[in-house]
Amino acid sequence: MELFIVESPTKAKTIQKFLGKGFLVKATLGHVKDLPEKELGVDLRTLKAKYVYKRGKKKLVEQLKKLSRRSSIVYLGTDPDREGEAIAYFLKKDLEKVNKNIKRAVFYEITPEAIRESIRNAGDVNMNLVYAQFARRILDRLIGYLISPILWKEFKNYKLSAGRVQSPALRLIVEREREIQNFKVKKYYYVKALLRKGSEEFWAIYDYRYENPSDAKIIAKKLEKGYFSVYKVEKKKEKVSPPKPFITSDLQSEANAKFGFSSERTQKLAQELYEKGYITYPRTDSYRMNEKKAKEFMNYIEKKYGKEYVGRLRRFREKATAQGAHECIRPTSLREEIPEREELRLLYDLIFRRTIASLMKEMLLEREKVTVEAITPELKHPVYLVAKGLKIVFDGWSRVYPSEITEEKLPELYEGDLLDLVKTTLEERKTQPPPRYTEGTLIKTLEKLGIGRPSTYATIVKTLKERGYVEVKKKALVPTEIAFQVVEFLMERFPTLMDYKFTAQMEEKLDLVEEGKLNWKSVVYEFMEKIFGKELEMVR
């Protein structure tokens, strides 16, 4: 018998179907070991950590030991990231006491071919990934255990917490709210004319911003006595590239905008789709797509929509943080629909259509700019108004993945055409404050700043809500009063923790640990020194 160990029962069930007899697939139900719940669990001088079994996991490991003893080989098929590697590491340490033949099987999608290939190429646990997880876990523990109690004491509120990613994210939300509160709305005005050619009407706008409505009214009144004609017609073709395939941040952002899903809900659903074998691994920051799969998708496009819709597999400049072997989030097959509950079907359909759209031809647009000349005895010089039109010449990728681009139709206009004036009017506009963050826009902002990674995005807003820092109103994240107070306190007491640049640099250093280019302890020591400074001696 060969033993194959994964984290979740769903994943185990899917893989068991693929491997059949001769294999036994078992699940750990997540991490088996972690730092203790009721103590720091880390020696601050040596960084030696005290990892203990999570509740119920010692018994589970004993059961796995019995199975390992009876197995010819043990494969550790946990997720292909820092957390999955740490689970594999602790399992190996326990199981190699009874069976030395233990291999790490790495795969990025749950299909028969991918699982068999992971078995053929099974190797050892990647210690660089494990060290990066140690560093991440210890950093988070230090902040949780050393800073959170300071907040409890200061604000007499035991729900409060601080975090390496959580606190800078809260700062973003609070600073945006301050911008909104300090924003002064200003009204301004444009003069518009409703014009007619034959039986067709269209609007043209005088492109001058009036602060005073009475000034705009004077011009509008004078234009009522004017003669209007087409002065110039400019047409320009424009290509609109298809969207990129999904990475974690894009998927969470899009599902939030389209379905109102929280990032945590999207991640749970995506994980379930992955474990059932429908999509590739959902925690990724790489846009890369397997060439063989891309060809299959492009053949599908040709058969379903025609050759003119087939695009190409584009190469994207990968972020420095993108892991080489990871792919974008894509379907594992050409299955258009899945026999699952509605939430899963919705998310799968979104991923399927986005993947197909990313390999289709560009949209082709024609933009039209018509300059209208108005001559009136009331004014010394002509006034020029502008009308804009937009025509979709070829729908391309938007046939599969709806675009926000809409047609703006104008009559067929030629230079010299005489036009009738129907009426003039003022259009009142207001300066807009910056919008509040939604979960989706917050994640995209954090990603742009280099804060957080695909595995952490889903938990950020969940934690902020649980701690009473934010409320969700009409999808927007609204900070509570305590959020303002905590951000102000942390900015004064622990400014480095709240510094966006420093947080991003720490993320980069964790990535370098993952690549084997930095020692994990040196990263933790540097972080401790910069965050806690002299206070570190007090807690030591």
From Swiss-Prot:
Signal peptide: none annotated. Pfam families: Topoisom_bac, Toprim. The active site is at Y281 (o-(5'-phospho-dna)-tyrosine intermediate). Residues 161-166 are annotated as: Interaction with DNA. The record marks H31, R136, R137, D140, Y145, W152, R283, R467 as: Interaction with DNA. Monomer. Residues 1-110 form the Toprim domain. Transmembrane segments: none annotated. One of its GO terms (molecular function) is metal ion binding. GO terms for biological process: DNA topological change. Releases the supercoiling and torsional tension of DNA, which is introduced during the DNA replication and transcription, by transiently cleaving and rejoining one strand of the DNA duplex. Introduces a single-strand break via transesterification at a target site in duplex DNA. The scissile phosphodiester is attacked by the catalytic tyrosine of the enzyme, resulting in the formation of a DNA-(5'-phosphotyrosyl)-enzyme intermediate and the expulsion of a 3'-OH DNA strand. The free DNA strand then undergoes passage around the unbroken strand, thus removing DNA supercoils. It comes from Aquifex aeolicus (strain VF5). Its cofactor is Mg(2+). The gene is topA. Residues 126-536 form the Topo IA-type catalytic domain. Belongs to the type IA topoisomerase family. This is DNA topoisomerase 1. Mg(2+) binds at E7, D79. Its EC number is 5.6.2.1. Keywords: DNA-binding, Isomerase, Magnesium, Metal-binding, Topoisomerase. It catalyses: ATP-independent breakage of single-stranded DNA, followed by passage and rejoining.
